[in-house]
Regions:
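Active-site-proximal beta-strand elements of phosphoester/diester hydrolases
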Residues: 219-224
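N-terminal beta1-alpha1 cap of cysteine-dependent amidohydrolase-like domains
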Residues: 1-113, 125-126, 133, 137-171, ...
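The feature captures the ABC ATPase H-loop/switch
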Residues: 121
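Conserved G/P- and acidic residue-centered "switch" motifs that form tight phosphate/ATP-binding loops
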Residues: 118
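Short, basic/aromatic beta-hairpin or loop at an interaction surface
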Residues: 174-175
Length: 252
């Protein structure tokens, strides 16, 4: 793998999604954190052929200052060796999968910081060899309610820092005070991907935050949607960690 290219202040943050409604709040959040739209490149897989999405995604990330994988539909279960449950098939975003795998290949090669949100969090896990529960309500007993789509900023359960996560920067942010989160997912990490550290879990054991144990590649993800919770200092600090990683890379 090649080393990190020399960063410049002009390097952009790539935002990956299938469509605008998945990326709009992330665009606004990055702008709030000082990464304006002139420093963002948004790629929507639904606007491109699969070949275009793969080519443009890899090219964009290779020279990027950061990559955000937004929330959205489901990762194809075939990527972790399973057949899709019948009701999961309709929400699979195959074109987005292809684009994001190419993006992550480029990010890993060039050590581009990556932040995964909800579906993006799950994508990171599968990319690194992990698996998912395809549908928590039907596959796992006695779980919390993990899906409330509206209002987007409704805080519906706590997350708690794990013993493994206490030494991480993300763990320190989440341990500052009680951490309540919004939640709108029906899938979850089942087996962790290679190198991922479970930083936080909900009371039912569902993994809610991860970091990659690799000093040369900044990669973090959360199962909730901090981009909808920017008025809360703790949640803004979660997002700020990515912004800081972007600025460190852009500054070379």
């Amino acid at each position: 793998m090649s080393g990190t290219p020399t960063g410049t202040s002009a390097a952009k943050v790539v935002i990956a999604a299938a469509m605008h409604r998945e990326s709009e709040c992330v665009i606004d959040t990055l702008e709030l954190l000082g990464i304006g739209q002139d420093r963002q490149r948004v790629l929507h897989s639904d606007d491109l052929s699969v070949a275009e999405a793969v080519e443009q995604g890899a090219e964009a990330v290779a020279g990027a200052a950061g990559l955000v994988l937004c929330g959205g539909g489901d990762v194809a279960p075939r990527r972790y060796g399973e057949a899709a449950l019948p009701w999961v098939r309709i929400s699979i975003q195959k074109g987005r999968d292809e684009m994001e795998w190419a993006m992550l290949d480029a990010a890993r090669e060039h050590r581009v910081p990556v932040w995964g949100i909800c579906r993006g969090f799950q994508t990171l896990n599968v990319y690194l060899g992990g698996t998912l529960w395809q549908d928590l309500p039907t596959q796992v007993s006695n779980t919390l309610a993990h899906h409330l789509s509206s209002p987007r900023d409704a805080l519906i359960h706590d997350v708690e820092v794990t013993p493994e996560g206490r030494g991480s920067g993300l763990g320190e942010v989440l341990a500052r005070e009680r951490c309540l989160v919004n939640s709108r997912h029906h899938q979850a990490i089942r087996e962790l991907g290679d190198g991922l550290v479970p930083v936080a879990r909900s009371a039912d054991g569902v993994v809610e935050a991860v970091v990659l144990d690799d000093p040369d590649w900044w990669l973090e993800g959360v199962e909730w949607h901090p981009e909808n919770l920017m008025p809360l200092p703790q949640q803004r600090a979660v997002a700020q960690r990515f912004a800081d990683a972007v600025e460190a890379r852009a500054g070379g």
